[in-house]
């Protein structure tokens, strides 16, 4: 290398003395003129459009590039499938970003919405095509593995001065994750205790709006961060594995099937001394450069069998190491001997149902499509006919409802996304089309707290059960008094609270879920509410009535006079 001889190494594993420029940036290494040397050169080797010839070239990371192209962060398959499933009347369509990049038009309103409102966040998107947060997104491999590109771009190449090449790293900073994961489920914000507020910019600071701002003219309030962030000082990569983030080589239609990590992977760990897992641990530890080298320790495995190289066990002692600085954390493993973990009837409850401190919830948002306007299509980069406008109703964070996740049976916190949609090509009012669709999703809100919900918070809160904000009357549920959001006062012809999934009889008011996620059934609600009759007095997990609650329930229903609660009632 004779032209750019004063350039820093991207990292210890890609020294310029060995790689030069052309191995990553292409071009002609044998040319003697600048024009010829730069012919065919690429600025971003991580761009998925060229990655097969750069990062994925022979002897480099070919298998990883193939995995990334099939992963949901490149395909957006989960977003596309969910969006179409929520758009009433549309048939499922299996597609992905790479296929859509070759199409000039949307085909239907759902795809037009995706192209103009969602498609600025995927790994096929060119990096630095704008001067805002959206411009920082995309770029294939570089989206995650380049940490300081902004500073590097600001540099000018000056003869005789060292040019600081953007650094490559496997110690991916959480900022690289949050630049994308701050919309929709907003888990990147929630994890660090940031709750996106209603958008008023309050509380005001002097004569101006609040300085706690997010991209897109949004604001946030400080809430309790996830305990892994506040106490453990852990980054996203400390839990989320490379196999999970970059994909496992399979094409997944939703993010759930690509996920690899679980609470149990660390808190009910399974360790291995298998040669293959130990070899993977040694290799990943060497690339990380912060996590200590294993000294004969067993390594933990995820549900897919991925080696968690930063979680190890030796002589009964479990050690977790942060990937950013190698800091050691003593893990508290799960104990089924604790009465609250082995309580009969709680077998289906997920960790998140009890230990999530709060969860973003959106109600009453309005989506308008105007044929007369124009808006940029993120996939073509050019404006096209039709413009979308989003208006929010109200957001909440407290007491998320619980329900059943997907086609399984586990109880999870539910987050709604309620959108009213108006579209009429003639600009006329359309009546007689009732709105009864509330999209719900069950996921980990990333607001883990060591203290769990109390018994009454689950068994005695109508909102948690799916009835919306209200109050209990004995063993039944009344309507909210007043409702959190009065739909009729806002011009919506609805006779139920917007935050209610069920009416007082347990009948479904509004629901839409592409994966089978649902609120509790009438029978499940009745079972949950019956416990609420008891927890006022029997408020300890170890109380003897819970050892065989079915028997206790039968004794109560039979009117057994020896029971203190019935004797007091009869007296």
Annotated model-derived regions:
Residues 135-165:
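Long, hydrophobic, well-ordered secondary-structure blocks that form the structural core
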Residues 1-10, 16-130, 148-150, 166-571:
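C-type cytochrome heme-c attachment and multiheme electron-transfer modules
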Residues 14-15, 134-136:
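Short helix-terminating capping/connector loops at secondary-structure junctions
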């Amino acid at each position: 290398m004779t032209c750019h001889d004063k350039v820093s190494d991207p990292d210890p594993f890609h020294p310029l003395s060995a790689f030069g420029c052309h191995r990553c940036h292409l071009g002609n290494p044998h040319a003697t003129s600048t024009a010829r040397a730069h012919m065919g050169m690429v600025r971003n080797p991580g761009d998925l459009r060229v990655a097969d010839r750069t990062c994925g070239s022979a002897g480099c990371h070919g298998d990883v590039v193939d995995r990334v192209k099939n992963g949901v962060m490149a395909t957006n398959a989960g977003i596309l499938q969910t969006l179409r499933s929520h758009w009433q009347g549309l048939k499922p369509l299996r597609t992905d970003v790479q296929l859509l990049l070759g199409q000039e038009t949307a085909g239907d309103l759902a795809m037009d919405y995706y192209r103009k409102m969602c498609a600025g966040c995927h790994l096929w998107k060119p990096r630095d095509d704008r001067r805002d947060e959206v411009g920082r997104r995309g770029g294939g491999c570089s989206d995650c593995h380049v940490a300081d590109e902004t500073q590097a771009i600001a540099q000018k190449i000056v003869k005789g001065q060292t040019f600081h090449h953007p650094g490559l790293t496997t110690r991916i900073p959480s900022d690289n994750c949050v630049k994308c994961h701050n919309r929709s489920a907003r888990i990147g914000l929630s994890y660090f205790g940031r709750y996106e507020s209603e958008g008023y910019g309050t509380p005001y600071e002097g004569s101006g709006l609040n300085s706690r701002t997010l991209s897109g003219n949004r604001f946030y309030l400080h809430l309790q961060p996830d305990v892994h962030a506040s106490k453990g000082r852990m980054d996203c990569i400390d839990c989320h594995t490379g196999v999970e983030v970059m994909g496992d080589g399979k094409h997944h239609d939703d993010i759930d099937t690509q996920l690899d990590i679980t609470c149990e992977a660390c808190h009910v760990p399974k360790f291995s001394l298998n040669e293959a897992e130990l070899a993977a641990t040694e290799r990943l530890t060497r690339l990380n450069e912060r996590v200590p080298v294993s000294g004969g320790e067993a390594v933990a495995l995820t549900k897919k069998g991925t080696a968690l190289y930063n979680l190890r066990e030796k002589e009964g002692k479990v050690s977790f190491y942060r990937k950013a600085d190698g800091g050691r954390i003593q893990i508290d493993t799960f104990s089924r001997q604790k009465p609250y973990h082995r309580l009969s009837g709680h077998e289906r409850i997920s960790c998140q149902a009890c230990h999530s401190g709060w969860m973003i919830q959106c109600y009453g948002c309005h989506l308008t499509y105007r044929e007369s306007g124009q808006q940029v299509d993120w996939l073509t980069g050019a404006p096209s006919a039709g413009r979308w406008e989003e208006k929010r109703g109200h957001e909440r964070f407290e007491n998320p409802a619980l329900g059943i996740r997907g086609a399984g049976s586990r109880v999870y916190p539910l987050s709604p996304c309620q959108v009213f949609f108006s579209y009429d090509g003639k600009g006329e009012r359309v009546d007689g089309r009732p709105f009864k669709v509330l999209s719900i999703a069950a996921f980990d809100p990333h607001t883990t707290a060591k203290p769990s919900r109390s018994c009454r918070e689950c068994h005695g809160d109508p909102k948690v059960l799916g009835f919306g904000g209200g109050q209990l009357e004995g063993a039944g549920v009344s309507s909210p008094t007043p409702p959190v959001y009065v739909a009729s006062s806002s011009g919506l012809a609805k006779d139920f609270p917007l935050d209610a999934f069920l009416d007082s009889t347990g009948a479904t008011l509004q629901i839409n879920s592409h994966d089978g996620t649902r609120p509790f059934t009438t029978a499940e609600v009745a079972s949950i509410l019956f416990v609420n009759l008891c927890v006022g007095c029997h408020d300890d997990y170890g109380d003897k009535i819970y050892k065989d609650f079915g028997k206790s329930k039968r004794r109560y229903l039979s009117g057994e006079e020896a029971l203190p609660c019935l004797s007091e009632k009869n007296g």
